[in-house]
Structures are given as structure tokens and as C-alpha cells.
């Protein structure tokens, strides 16, 4: 089994390797490709443009040539899957799609935490659509200043800010908190009140494995 991942941050590779180990994937099961330029372009443009979506789609197509499944690990670029999903023979997934499905499953108030402004719109659409079948109430919260901490290399400060936002969401009555960006996964262990927040790396990889097992 080989799962190819398209990242926009080098630091996310170790996060997904940890998630792979947690769900029992063997060493070498993941192949990583990092395209930081795609997220940088989206941030500069104020969101995902058609041109950036095409570039993302081309990268996904290339990864699919030597993989059993492809996972797009960037929430901002997520909608770009629509460019190629019908042209790729292997499963291609948004890492946050499985997260959204899991988060809304039991209904209640679901708070999805974002750090990047360009992620807010695609995350809102994704979680709102997922909630239609369960009746969950969805709220998207952007954490001011968090992404600047990430980009300057202050990982500890970044995760602390995300954890603080998650705890605030629970204080405000959230049933479950979803950490919408893969880079946030480490913050789940820092949250002291409420259920452990859900994160996308484990959910996304588990969904890919499930799809592959259904096809075999």
C-alpha cells in the first residue's frame, strides 16, 4: 500500500508519519511531496484561484501515477480536488473531508479551528455540507496571529494558541472541536478541558486506508 500526500509545509511530514504509525501503517507506506509555493500563491491571491487549482490538480495527477491513493493535506487547496477527481483512477481525498464527517457525526455544536484566512471559506463549505445529514451546528473560528507564529517557526507558540482557542470553544459550549489544518494536530494533546479535539492527519489517513480496503 502506498499513499501519496501533497503538503504545503515541510513540517507536516512528521505529523503524518506519526499519524501513520498510530493507525498501524507500515514504514514506507507514505510518499510526501511538498509544494509550499501553492499555499503562498493562494495567500497572496486571497484564496484559491482557478490557476492555483489547476496547478494543484496537476501535482495530484502526477502523484497518482505511482500511488494507490492520494491525499491533499492542505485545507486551503482542498477544493482543487474537483479539478481531477474524475481523471484519477485511484482514490483522491481531502484530508479534512474525513475530519468534517467525523466531527459532525454525533450532532451538537461543532467548532472548527482555522489559522489561515484562506482556509476559512473552504472549511466553512466543507463542514456545513457535512452537517446537513446530521443536524450538527457548525461554527468556524479563526485564531488571530496564530499563522504568523507558524510561519516564523514558533511551533510551540502556534500550538499553544490553537489549544487556547479550542479550550475557549469548549468553554462556550462546543460539543466537539475540530482542528481544521493538519499543522494543528499537536495542539490536541495540550487541551485540558473537554473531549480531545479531532485532527485531520489521523482521520484522513484512516479514510484512505478504508477506501483502499474496500477496493481490494
Labelled PLM ranges:
Residues 1-216:
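Non-catalytic structural scaffold of enzyme domains
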Amino acid at each position: 500500500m502506498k499513499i501519496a500526500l501533497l503538503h504545503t509545509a515541510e513540517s507536516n511530514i512528521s505529523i503524518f508519519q506519526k499519524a501513520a504509525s498510530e493507525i498501524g501503517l507500515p514504514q514506507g507506506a507514505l510518499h510526501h511531496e511538498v509544494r509550499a509555493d501553492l499555499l503562498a500563491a493562494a495567500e497572496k491571491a486571497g484564496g484559491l484561484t482557478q490557476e492555483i487549482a489547476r496547478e494543484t490538480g496537476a501535482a495530484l495527477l502526477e502523484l497518482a501515477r505511482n500511488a494507490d491513493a492520494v491525499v491533499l493535506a492542505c485545507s486551503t487547496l482542498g477544493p482543487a480536488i474537483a479539478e481531477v477527481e474524475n481523471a484519477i483512477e485511484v482514490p483522491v481525498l481531502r484530508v479534512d473531508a474525513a475530519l468534517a464527517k467525523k466531527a459532525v457525526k454525533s450532532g451538537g455544536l461543532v467548532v472548527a479551528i482555522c489559522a489561515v484566512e484562506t482556509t476559512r471559506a473552504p472549511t466553512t463549505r466543507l463542514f456545513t455540507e457535512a452537517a446537513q445529514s446530521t443536524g450538527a451546528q457548525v461554527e468556524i473560528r479563526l485564531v488571530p496571529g496564530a499563522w504568523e507564529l507558524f510561519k516564523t517557526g514558533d511551533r510551540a507558540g502556534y500550538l499553544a494558541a490553537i489549544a487556547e482557542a479550542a479550550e475557549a470553544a469548549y468553554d462556550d459550549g462546543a460539543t466537539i472541536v475540530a482542528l481544521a489544518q493538519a499543522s494543528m494536530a499537536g495542539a490536541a494533546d495540550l487541551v485540558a478541558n473537554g473531549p480531545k479535539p479531532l485532527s485531520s492527519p489521523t482521520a484522513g489517513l484512516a479514510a484512505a486506508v478504508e477506501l483502499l480496503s474496500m477496493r481490494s
